[in-house]
Amino acid sequence: MSYTPMSDLGQQGLFDITRTLLQQPDLASLCEALSQLVKRSALADNAAIVLWQAQTQRASYYASREKDTPIKYEDETVLAHGPVRSILSRPDTLHCSYEEFCETWPQLDAGGLYPKFGHYCLMPLAAEGHIFGGCEFIRYDDRPWSEKEFNRLQTFTQIVSVVTEQIQSRVVNNVDYELLCRERDNFRILVAITNAVLSRLDMDELVSEVAKEIHYYFDIDDISIVLRSHRKNKLNIYSTHYLDKQHPAHEQSEVDEAGTLTERVFKSKEMLLINLHERDDLAPYERMLFDTWGNQIQTLCLLPLMSGDTMLGVLKLAQCEEKVFTTTNLNLLRQIAERVAIAVDNALAYQEIHRLKERLVDENLALTEQLNNVDSEFGEIIGRSEAMYSVLKQVEMVAQSDSTVLILGETGTGKELIARAIHNLSGRNNRRMVKMNCAAMPAGLLESDLFGHERGAFTGASAQRIGRFELADKSSLFLDEVGDMPLELQPKLLRVLQEQEFERLGSNKIIQTDVRLIAATNRDLKKMVADREFRSDLYYRLNVFPIHLPPLRERPEDIPLLAKAFTFKIARRLGRNIDSIPAETLRTLSNMEWPGNVRELENVIERAVLLTRGNVLQLSLPDIVLPEPETPPAATVVALEGEDEYQLIVRVLKETNGVVAGPKGAAQRLGLKRTTLLSRMKRLGIDKSALI
């Protein structure tokens, strides 16, 4: 019966050995455990692991010496020309005496790595038929190994092969994992800094934000952005110093460019990393670093801010500890400098636009509105409630498309602000949004205002007029109170939405337009469609992406924010110095119903600001009277058998002698609002004057 190496140890013995070796975290520990096992088994006095590095043609050596620290050599050339090279070409067990060992590999004997021994054995470590090293066993006495002992050593070697491969794989995986984690963290830092700086158009704010982020992530205490001044040979320096971590100091100054380290970077367009000493020949403003930080040695990193081939400025970072500027951190700081360069470019462009706005009033109107709102994607919208968060998420989702949006909500909920936010976030925000209130325009003029008219199209049309749809070409048109649009005008609006074309009044020329429509109403369009007061086809065309604005009573947590914002805005406008609102007032405001929503709240706050004496808002809450909601009257007549709506209205009008409103009017008897009855009469073609 042939001998199986592992059977000699027994199942439990093999399990114990395997478990012991598998528990080792690294190769040094593995070698230590292996040495102890072979000593206890009286198989050898010492053991070592030699790994072959095929790419570099070198070897790594791990050994354990009694009463000594573990021995570890990596990337060794001398070891690579030792016994391990022999088993690579002839994968058999290598066995020799000390004299034979020294004669074959004298360089190893001269190196003192191997103390005098009796017998030496090297068995190949292999995985999937590939030899990647060897396992050394040494006896210090003259006893040779028996065949049985060789077999046991072979068993140990097989286990060590598996464990070594696992440890190496784990090391590679850990390195890869650490690399991925570092890349992930670096990406998060880049995203955070990009988001923080790209919206800053004021240079002071930009530098402050850049400094805050770099200090937070890198613990760098002195951050500056250096730009060339419009004055020749001068530099504008925007600096932030974190002498006090909680209260950083911000400075702006102008200095001479000549002889500065910044000048060197402007010329070379390359990063400069340098250790500064107080005895160095430095420009005055650079020497101030030692005054600021107590004469400590400064490490200075200057990164060019490039926009294409144009040098915009320099990001200057100073730190007392050189270890901050590691290779990894420098690579990340270079990428941060690229983002900062974009932000600086934007800020400089903004400054140029601001300088030219007096000369370009008409052309810059839309751009000025956009820049005024650039610090907030949602302009003047105030709210942190879940209801408003849901609305703003919908705004973000639909803004970049050209889909029609229908904004639904009670009066005073801020439908126009939502429409403006959609426009500002869209690709059409380089042009001004055109607005129109359908309820504020007489029906006879609404068509002319929307579509324009030619000269002489009707009495009083003395000149051609461009309508809102033409003005809104390549932009957005906001139709407020679209539910009040007359029925006879609705088909023409539908045609524009479907065909993107229309005709001016008094003209048969078709005008093409590219308009994104945003409509709003506080009315129930579904009910109006059911009552035949609104066209169903237009409703479905408008209702592509409805956004429901919550009334103020459904987001009471936003009321304190709104109250504070209105108070400070109105006080500033009226020249009042009001800087606080009593907590009890805010609680009371939050518990009110606000049928007029945000608009009503703003009006109440404005009245309170006018009446306040002092710097604390004084609000007389008993003066606020909430109107009862209007309810339709109860009907006092019913339709007779076989009588339709037309016949019923005609009969009641005859009974009231054509009187529609009032306590004895037809609307009261039918249980309808006056406006509802008039709308139905118009739809049914009923002329009350013909009935009297």
Curated annotation (Swiss-Prot):
User: What GO biological process terms are annotated to this protein in UniProt?
Assistant: DNA-templated transcription; phosphorelay signal transduction system; positive regulation of DNA-templated transcription; positive regulation of DNA-templated transcription initiation
Residues bound to ATP are 409-416, 472-481
- Tell me the PANTHER family matching this sequence: DNA-BINDING TRANSCRIPTIONAL ACTIVATOR HYFR-RELATED, TRANSCRIPTIONAL REGULATORY PROTEIN
The GAF domain is annotated at 202-344
List residues annotated as DNA-binding: 663-682
What is the protein name for this chain?
A: Formate hydrogenlyase transcriptional activator FhlA
Q: Which GO terms describe its cellular component?
A: protein-DNA complex; transcription regulator complex
Offer one Pfam family short name for this entry: Sigma54_activat
- Give the organism the record lists: Escherichia coli (strain K12)
* InterPro entries cross-referenced by the UniProt entry: AAA+_ATPase (IPR003593), GAF (IPR003018), GAF-like_dom_sf (IPR029016), Homeodomain-like_sf (IPR009057), HTH_Fis (IPR002197), P-loop_NTPase (IPR027417), Sigma_54_int (IPR002078), Sigma_54_int_dom_ATP-bd_1 (IPR025662)
Q: What happens when the gene is disrupted?
A: Loss of formate-inducible expression of the hyf operon.
Q: Identify the keywords attached in UniProt to this record, alphabetized.
A: Activator, ATP-binding, DNA-binding, Nucleotide-binding, Transcription, Transcription regulation, Two-component regulatory system
Where do the Sigma-54 factor interaction domain residues begin and end? 381-610
